[in-house]
Amino acid sequence: MKKLHLMLCILAVVLVGCGKGTGRTLTSATGSVYECLVVMNDAPLTQDQINEVAKLSLVNEASGYTKPIANLYDLVEAVMGADMPCMPQVEPYFRVTKVSTAQFDDMFKPTRNILIVDINPQKYTQLKTKVFNDYWSTPQALCRIQTPSEEEFVSYWIEHGEEIREWFVNQEITRQMKFYRASTNKQARAILQSQGYDMLIPEDYMVIMDTVLGGATTYSLRNPITVAPEVRLLWCCNNKGSMRRDIVVYSYPYTDNNTFTLPYLNAKRDAVLSRVITASVEGSYMGTEYTVMPPVTRAITVQEDEHATEVRGLWKILNGEAMGGPYVSHTRLDQVNGRIVTAETFLYAAGQKKRTALRQAEAILYTLQLPQDTIK
């Protein structure tokens, strides 16, 4: 399985390192997943900088960060601690804590995710960004931003802060992917491999359905269903504990140039899943929330240089129980067989925080491998 390709598209010089030294035994990282320690000396923003920041999407209800930004740390926290999109509860990308440069000692160095902002005109003549894996501990992600001035850092962070955040997110996803390699559902993997695909679905997921959905009636665990033709679908579920996690992978012929647009993917999701996933009330089915928090999409990079369309949204049960939760899907083109492949995860956990569980399930989607990935 090829390693997830991580891109940090920034204009500054980027150096990637692994470990502070060679042959060292690293301690285990401290802190929880999706926590980030920010090491920096704070300073107030100028009024011009405050006015510039106020014009951006960093501070509004959509970003989830609405408190005033008056200093450098506020600016960093506005990005790293912004709300994740399309979540039923308010949950940030990262839980952010801060220490000053003087406070950053050996007690803090093993922290799992560290962002160091070093502003020093005596040491630096230009801004540089360096990223490291397993520098003081393992697993650890470390990003250093070195700059001669506060003004240069503010301009840089406004333009590239979200890319830095994405790098940290990708580090967490990569760690989770490595964990899945040690324990996969052999039945689910064999089903996908028979279609020319591969995916690391964990062994604690159970195969619910594997079928070709066509004009004829097919069987689900609950109801006979009839769906549009030429859709091959695998549905797996982990219903252990207080949270339910589901994975669906479905493919269909590539026939429409609009396939990778949000309206098309929304319609295809509704057409397939509404006929497959039902609830206990007769006539109920899986739907998508379009009014309160519509789905959002973006292009992402998976495998090495392959592209996928990511969709995030909220699912809900229609004509039945008051059930719903977040979902994430990746859609790619199988270039060898001319088929579209969508892998989606969705969660149900009433009243519980879901960010970490969703990210863990999302990491499964990144392991999807299509025929062209093995040819490279």
Language-model segments: which ranges?
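Long, folded non-catalytic interaction modules
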Residues: 27-160, 165
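C-terminal motif of bacterial Sec signal peptides marking the signal peptidase cleavage site
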Residues: 14-17
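Surface-exposed amphipathic alpha-helical segments
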Residues: 152-178, 339-376
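Bacterial lipoprotein signal-peptidase II cleavage site
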Residues: 19-25
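Signature of long, low-cysteine stretches enriched in small and polar/charged residues
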Residues: 90-145, 151-152, 273-337
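Short, well-ordered beta-strand elements
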Residues: 140-149, 245-252, 338-348
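Positively charged n-region of N-terminal signal peptides that target proteins for export
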Residues: 1-4
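Secretory pathway targeting signatures of secreted, lumenal, and periplasmic proteins
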Residues: 37-39, 53-67, 204-280
